[in-house]
Amino acid sequence: MRSNNNNPLTRDEILSRYFPQYRPAVATSQGLSGGSCIIAHDTHRVVLRRHHDPDAPPAHFLRHYRALSQLPASLAPRALFYTPGWMAVEYLHGVVNSALPDADELAALLYHLHQQPRFGWRIALSPLLAQYWSCCDPARRTPFWLRRLKQLQKNGEPRPLRLAPLHMDVHGDNIVLTSAGLRLIDWEYAGDGDIALELAAVWVEDERQHRQLADAYAARARIDARQLWRQIRLWHPWVIMLKAGWFEYRWRQTGEQQFIRLADETWRQLRMKG
């Protein structure tokens, strides 16, 4: 269901107009951010998501909805409703763990995603990194950051090994173990890109876990494991800069100290690696 109303509504207006029998449920952290909430009617729950990034154009939020609309139920929650500024999606009942699933399970989930038809829009990291630089706190801009940004822009993004639809925010809190298996939530960064970029961006604990995931994926996708790992390493500098820039961006938006701590730690990692 999609509304054609062009004026963003408040949450209460959304509820009264489109979900009159629903009420906000007890707060939960399942894939929620920036004013999103769970609404419930009897035992039925729906996730009501708000477009919470003031610097992102409305088209990005619509892409999120379109991605969910074309993904199968074996991967993601169903998209239920869209109006400018809001969407409603299926609530997935299950268990969310902070830790990633084991390598074989996660590789199977990602390979299943990468076998789907492409979304129709490419992920471009270079303009995104430039946006993070321009939108961050000016006091946080350093010569080191600028040098790294210009070096990546000069080199250009790696040539894709294999193009596919990507999730691009794979970590334990975005994976739900349902009665039917693993599902991914929080698809706001989804787009088409290199499968090795997806694997490079997974929030792993260490290189050992990363190699296990890469090897499991290579076996499933019938790709040479060494070739895949080399491609993942080519994307690694981009992913680290992406994370550092995103932490800076979110700190400027929210003022939450967790983001500045994460940004500082990521910059330290970058400096240690030269």
Swiss-Prot record:
Belongs to the thiamine kinase family. This is Thiamine kinase. GO terms for biological process: thiamine diphosphate biosynthetic process; thiamine metabolic process. It catalyses: thiamine + ATP = thiamine phosphate + ADP + H(+). Keywords: ATP-binding, Kinase, Nucleotide-binding, Transferase. Pathway: Cofactor biosynthesis; thiamine diphosphate biosynthesis; thiamine phosphate from thiamine: step 1/1. The keyword Cell inner membrane does not apply. It is an enzyme of class 2 (transferase). It comes from Salmonella typhimurium (strain LT2 / SGSC1412 / ATCC 700720). Catalyzes the ATP-dependent phosphorylation of thiamine to thiamine phosphate. Is involved in thiamine salvage. Its EC number is 2.7.1.89. InterPro entries: Aminoglycoside_PTrfase, Kinase-like_dom_sf, Thiamine_kinase. One of its GO terms (molecular function) is ATP binding. NCBIfam families: PRK10271.1, ycfN_thiK. The keyword Plastid does not apply.
